[in-house]
Design a protein with these regions (language model features):
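Acidic, Ser/Thr-rich, low-complexity intrinsically disordered regions in fungal proteins
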Residues: 1-102, 122-137, 154-178
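Long, repeat-rich segments with strong aromatic
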Residues: 102-123
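C-terminal substrate/ligand-recognition segments
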Residues: 182-189
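Aromatic-acidic/polar surface patches that form glycan- and anion
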Residues: 30, 100, 104-107, 142, ...
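A conserved active-site cap/scaffold subdomain adjacent to cofactor or substrate pockets
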Residues: 136, 143-146
Length: 189
């Protein structure tokens, strides 16, 4: 629900920029605040509706709102030459590789998207999965669906820099930098 609310705000901002550019005075910082608010709402909706039978119907890869810029770029009001879009969150996109803790909101958002779909899959198919025999597993559509989800999860993890991965990097390192909670979220997903 929060995602739909912020999506309406972004739509109004986009319409205003498109139809009345001389009257739209949002700075880059204000625009980025809207973007970050949108993705925080998306993550919150994922967290609150985890495992719900009918999770909200937004497909992550089809969302046209750009992903947040790094914390450093945001803090220093630097506009990167190009922005990551949700559809770019794969191993084929150079911008998506080696994401550090400064891209934590992007990492968490994508992680929650995958987590919700895995949890929904497990909830909806737990009886069928429990009754699968080893002979069924080679051709089962359920197993194929699980493999696709697992591949997405593995790809998501591979896009992260080693400094974001526990236990390769200690929690204390990120706590010292003020990123302890974010580091924990990423590694709990």
């Amino acid at each position: 629900m929060a995602t739909y609310m912020i999506q309406s705000l972004l739509k109004m901002a986009d319409d205003s920029m498109e139809h009345n550019p001389q009257e739209f005075h949002a700075s880059q910082t204000q625009y980025e605040q809207l973007v970050r608010t949108y993705w925080c709402c998306f993550a919150q909706d994922c967290e609150l509706s985890s495992g719900a039978r009918q999770h909200f119907a937004l497909s992550f890869s089809q969302i046209s709102v750009p992903l947040p810029i790094s914390d450093r770029d945001f803090t220093f009001n630097h506009t990167p030459a190009s922005r990551l879009m949700p559809a770019d969150m794969n191993k084929d996109c150079l911008l998506a590789k080696g994401l550090t803790i400064e891209h934590g909101l992007t990492i968490v958002t994508r992680g929650f998207d995958i987590f919700v779909r895995i949890l929904r899959f497990a909830n909806e198919h737990r009886r069928a999965l429990a009754s699968l025999s080893s002979d069924d597993s080679t051709i089962s559509p359920l197993l194929l669906t699980w493999q696709v989800l697992k591949e997405e999860l593995d790809e998501w993890r591979s896009l992260q820099d080693v400094t974001v991965r526990f236990p390769a990097t200690s929690v204390q390192s990120h706590v010292a930098l003020g990123y302890g909670e974010l580091f924990a979220y990423i590694n709990l997903i």
